Structures are given as structure tokens and as C-alpha cells.
């Protein structure tokens, strides 16, 4: 008797369902992207269809990029989520050994993190949640708020990130397994930091569950 687990595969040689061609094409598209503007890539599918396996094969086929795995499972507040994200993002970049501007980059991260936490602690209005739903549906939206302090620190961080000559791939998997509030927080976070240069977000989720969760949070 043979038992099969639902654990995702780790590399292309383990693929028995013909997903490696798609994974390779997606990886090539990321590698060939020469722009510095950030990208958000959504990988949609029901639970168990192999989204994590595809992500693993995509990462396997990427050429020398900085990979950031962000798992937003344990946090107590939105400001805590921001803190965890920037710790993970900054540490992954600094540990890669590719950032020659380590000192100024670390300083820029700290300043921006403090500024964005101040803004994020303001009450969330319903219009913003509606915008998050539109974001999931693929509608381009402008940044929903600004302040001089936030603008200044963001511009400095963008300048430092622009000096890195590799793409930064931020992977957030299983978004649909989070609570409704956590799902809202994740998309709010992505909207806040989605315009950084050289950063590509790969988001994996069940689109129907996520859209329903955001609608329910809006009520």
C-alpha cells in the first residue's frame, strides 16, 4: 500500500502533473523583465491544485535573484505585521551580499518603517477596503494616502533599492488560509509597499475566498 501526502514538490524533477513548463515560462518572464518598476503577480487556484509546487519550481528556475519568503501567520496588529515584513525584507536583502549600500539601505528601511507605522495606525475607512477588493480584481489604484514624512522616507528607500542590480522576489503563499482581517492587512501592506523599485511580489491564493473575505470585512 502506498500513501501520497499533499506536501508540495520542491523541484521540477518531482513534477508528475505537467506544471514545470508553466513554471519555467513564468520564471523566464521574471528574469527577462528589465524594468525597475515593481510588479505584483497573482497565482490563483483552489486549495490543493499545486500553487505552492508551482512557486517552488518558479524559484528553482530564477537566475540569481533575491528571494524573500514572507509568512504572515503570527502577528498581533497591523503595525506588527509591517514590522515583521520589513525585518524579513531588509534582512534578506542585506544577507544576500549584493547590496553595497548596506549602511544607507538599512537606515532607509528603519526610517520608512517608522513613518509607515504612524500612517497605518490611523482608522481604516470603508473606501480603502473597497479599493483593496478592486486591487485583488486587477484594477490599478493609486496610493491611498500620503504625508510629507512618509513621502520623504519612501523616496529615500526607493533610491537605495534602485541601486541593487538584482530583482527582489517577495513570496506570500496561502493568503486564503488567513483570517478575513489578516487578508485585509496583507493587501493593505502590499498596496503600501508595491511601488518600490526592483521588487516583484508573487502572491498565491484562492481568488474567490480572498474576494469574499474582503467583502465581509467591508460590511
Predicted regions and their residues:
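Conserved Walker B catalytic segment
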Residues: 149-212, 216-217
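Extended, composition-driven regions rather than compact fold-specific motifs
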Residues: 1-11, 16, 88-89, 134, ...
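Conserved structured core elements
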Residues: 16, 20, 24, 37, ...
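Glycine-rich, phosphate-binding/catalytic loops in enzymes
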Residues: 60, 86-87, 186-189, 219
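A short helix-turn-beta junction within AAA+ P-loop NTPase domains corresponding to the substrate/partner-engaging
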Residues: 65, 218-219
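Walker A/P-loop-proximal flanking segment of P-loop NTPase domains
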Residues: 1-75, 83, 193
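Switch/connector loops and helix/strand junctions flanking conserved nucleotide-binding motifs
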Residues: 51-52, 77-80, 209-214
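P-loop NTPase nucleotide-binding core
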Residues: 55, 60-163
Amino acid at each position: 500500500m502506498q500513501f501520497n501526502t499533499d506536501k508540495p514538490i520542491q523541484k521540477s524533477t518531482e513534477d508528475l502533473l505537467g506544471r514545470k513548463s508553466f513554471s519555467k515560462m513564468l520564471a523566464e518572464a521574471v528574469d527577462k523583465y528589465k524594468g525597475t518598476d515593481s510588479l505584483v503577480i497573482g497565482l490563483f487556484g483552489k486549495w490543493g491544485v499545486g500553487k505552492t509546487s508551482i512557486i517552488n519550481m518558479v524559484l528553482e528556475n530564477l537566475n540569481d535573484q533575491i528571494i524573500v519568503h514572507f509568512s504572515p501567520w503570527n502577528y498581533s496588529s497591523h503595525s506588527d505585521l509591517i514590522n515583521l515584513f520589513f525585518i524579513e525584507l531588509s534582512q534578506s536583502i542585506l544577507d544576500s551580499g549584493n547590496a553595497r549600500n548596506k549602511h544607507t539601505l538599512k537606515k532607509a528601511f528603519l526610517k520608512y518603517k517608522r513613518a509607515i507605522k504612524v500612517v497605518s495606525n490611523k482608522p481604516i475607512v470603508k473606501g480603502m477596503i473597497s479599493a483593496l477588493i478592486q486591487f485583488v480584481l486587477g484594477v490599478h489604484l493609486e496610493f491611498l494616502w500620503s504625508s510629507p514624512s512618509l513621502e520623504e522616507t519612501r523616496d529615500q528607500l526607493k533610491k537605495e533599492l534602485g541601486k541593487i542590480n538584482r530583482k527582489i522576489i517577495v513570496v506570500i503563499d496561502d493568503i486564503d488560509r488567513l483570517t478575513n482581517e489578516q487578508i485585509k492587512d496583507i493587501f493593505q501592506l502590499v498596496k503600501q509597499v508595491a511601488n518600490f523599485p526592483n521588487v516583484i511580489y508573487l502572491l498565491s491564493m484562492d481568488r474567490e475566498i480572498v474576494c469574499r473575505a474582503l467583502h465581509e470585512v467591508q460590511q
